[in-house]
Regions:
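Structural recognition of the conserved hydrophobic beta-strand(s) that form the central parallel beta-sheet
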Residues: 154-158, 171, 182-188
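Conserved strand-to-helix beginnings and helix N-cap segments that scaffold or border functional pockets
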Residues: 165-169, 297
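Conserved adenine-binding aromatic site and its adjacent loop/helix in ATP-hydrolyzing domains
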Residues: 141, 173, 200
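Conserved catalytic/switch belt of AAA+ P-loop NTPases
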Residues: 144, 169-183
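Clamp-loader machinery-focused feature within the broader ASCE/P-loop NTPase space
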Residues: 2-162, 166
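Charged, glycine-rich active-site and insertion segments that engage polyanionic ligands
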Residues: 1-69, 180-183, 189-302, 306-384
């Protein structure tokens, strides 16, 4: 993968290439950035620059046969680990090596893809993937071997926040004192979920969200769409190129999430003193509970963002509002006055608590019903 194929992040490209040119390569690095900012493509381009001894701050000019191997991510000294779970084909002890064909397809099709895209790709969208102890054993085994081409070995661990405790304990010593010429690149969207004993052993690089202009140019170059359309999509994407690509194809799950959200909000408004609306909320909770836990977490995160957007609209920060509801009968401007300083913190806390409990395998129907009843009270709270 060429550095020129990666949108923006020029200061990070310069830092990484200079560190290789100067021979100052940290053995463990943590790339931290929000979805769609390019952490994974950057890690792959960095690995190529390092393994192929490229020059001129680009992935050319070095070992051409090595560069060719990176075209289909088949270099023997490039290793990947990522969250997995058992599916219809792999029934037990799933590890990343079982899913490399699908992984390469995902990077070819959606290098800026998110965790949910990956779960859908391997058919585990109703499960929660993890990087477990079997994966840790595979990592230890693969990195104990000598490098195939006599140079560096690179281990890219994508979504490192999904490393469970047992795997983290097994990897700790290896990350602290890796074999000679071994580089770990851990990638995360949530730095706080990385255990401190691992984070403290890594050099941390923070990736900012992409600017609207960079996303706009990326969309024009990739899809040849009109500049004004690309500009509108870039604004809605809020720094996330993966979301921008989904919006081009109208392939975003946000459309379904918006329908669920609007029904939920309307039922919550009606539920005060209306028994029938309470039944609607319970039925809604049952329907959402039938989806996978990853879908539920994605949806609740969408709700969190929707409430924040409404708050910004209510306090006249319209330039920061990027959401545009597709429903003809729902207007953000009319909903915004019900989200204010007197209830937003409680709403946010309740949503984050629900995400926490769902992630830890709580009963989704009970969690969502409880959240719905609390939302009914909070939406009727008066602004102070």
């Amino acid at each position: 993968m060429l550095f020129t194929e990666i949108l923006g992040q020029e200061h990070i490209k310069a830092h990484l290439t200079q560190s290789v040119n100067n021979g100052r390569i940290a053995h463990a690095q943590l790339f931290v950035g929000p979805e769609g900012c390019g952490t994974l493509p950057m890690a792959i381009a960095y690995a190529q620059y390092l393994l192929c001894k490229n020059t001129e701050n680009e992935n050319t000019g070095g070992n051409e046969s090595c560069n060719l191997k990176f075209n289909n991510l088949s270099h023997p000294d490039l290793h990947f680990a990522f969250p997995v779970a058992a599916n219809g084909v792999i029934k037990s002890h799933p590890v990343s090596s079982h899913f490399l064909v699908e992984w390469r397809e995902l990077i070819e099709e959606q290098p800026y893809g998110n965790l949910f895209d990956w779960y859908k790709k391997i058919g585990i969208e109703k499960k929660q993937g993890q990087i477990g102890v079997d994966e840790a054993q595979d990592i230890v085994k693969s990195l104990s071997l000598k490098s195939y081409e006599g140079g560096y070995k690179v281990m890219i661990i994508w979504m490192a926040e999904k490393i469970n405790t047992q795997a983290a304990n097994k990897l700790l010593k290896l990350i602290e004192e890796p074999p000679n010429k071994t580089v770990f690149v851990l990638i995360t969207e949530d730095e706080e979920q990385i255990i401190n004993t691992i984070k403290s052993r890594c050099q941390v690089l923070h990736f900012p969200p992409l600017s609207e202009e960079i996303i706009k140019q990326g969309l024009i170059n990739k899809y040849s769409i009109a500049e004004d359309v690309a500009g509108k999509i870039a604004h809605q994407a809020n720094g996330n190129f993966n979301k921008a690509c989904d919006l081009v194809y109208q392939d975003t799950e946000d459309t379904q999430f918006e329908e669920w959200f609007i029904f939920w909000i309307r039922s919550a408004f009606k539920a005060r003193g209306n028994k029938n609306a309470i039944h609607d909320l319970i039925s809604w909770s049952e329907d959402i509970a039938k989806t996978g836990r990853e879908t539920q977490k994605q949806f609740l995160q969408f709700c969190l963002n929707f409430f924040r957007q409404a708050l910004l609209m209510n306090y006249n920060a319209s330039e920061l509002v990027f959401m545009e509801p597709k429903s003809e009968n729902f207007q953000l401007e009319k909903f915004a006055p019900f989200v204010h300083g007197n209830n937003i913190i409680e709403i946010s806390d309740e949503l984050q608590d629900a995400i926490y409990h769902i992630e830890r395998n709580g009963n989704s129907k009970i969690i969502l019903t409880d959240l719905s009843i609390k939302l009914t009270r909070l939406l009727h709270k008066k602004a102070s």
